[in-house]
Amino acid sequence: MANQELIDALRDAEAVKFGEFELSHGGTSEYYVDKYVFETDPGCLRQIADAFADRVGDAKLAGVALGAVPLVAATAVETDSPYVIVRKQKKEYGTGNQIEGDFDAGEEVVVLEDIATTGQSAIDAVEALREAGATVDRVIVVVDREEGARENLAEHDIELESLVTASDLLADR
């Protein structure tokens, strides 16, 4: 069932835009969900953190840098849980870490993400966490664009959950 309150908040914040947009995977779309709008709007961020908190259980939280960092931080505050940040690649300076924050080998981790289109950034984050010893089988996103992410993640034994889908956001528009 769609989270109508969150859908309304995303629409009211004007996070859903219409026009011609190039997406990060190279495709184009007639609509765009602007994560920076909903991640910087306190009302949207609060609703997202509350919704994530209802779903994460006791798992350690992980967010994909950069887009999911505000989401995982807000959810960590809501759940009083520590979290880790997964970079797209290892740093070439300082500690050289790809994963910032601590977790124990075998610990259950759930990845929080902003928007899923193909799911590749979530897959990359899960693979990095698994290589580091975490147990990861779930990714929760704010918006599933319904363009193959669920199927792509399933090929890697990862379940995709979404707070809302593109169909939810675009209904009645």
Curated annotation (Swiss-Prot):
It comes from Natronomonas pharaonis (strain ATCC 35678 / DSM 2160 / CIP 103997 / JCM 8858 / NBRC 14720 / NCIMB 2260 / Gabara). This is Orotate phosphoribosyltransferase. Belongs to the purine/pyrimidine phosphoribosyltransferase family. PyrE subfamily. InterPro entries: OPRT, Or_phspho_trans_dom, PRibTrfase_dom, PRTase-like. Orotate binds at T117, R145. GO terms for biological process: 'de novo' UMP biosynthetic process; pyrimidine nucleobase biosynthetic process. Homodimer. It is an enzyme of class 2 (transferase). The keyword Kinase does not apply. Keywords: Glycosyltransferase, Magnesium, Pyrimidine biosynthesis, Transferase. Its EC number is 2.4.2.10. The keyword ATP-binding does not apply. It comes from the Archaea. PANTHER family: OROTATE PHOSPHORIBOSYLTRANSFERASE, URIDINE 5'-MONOPHOSPHATE SYNTHASE. SUPFAM superfamilies: PRTase-like.
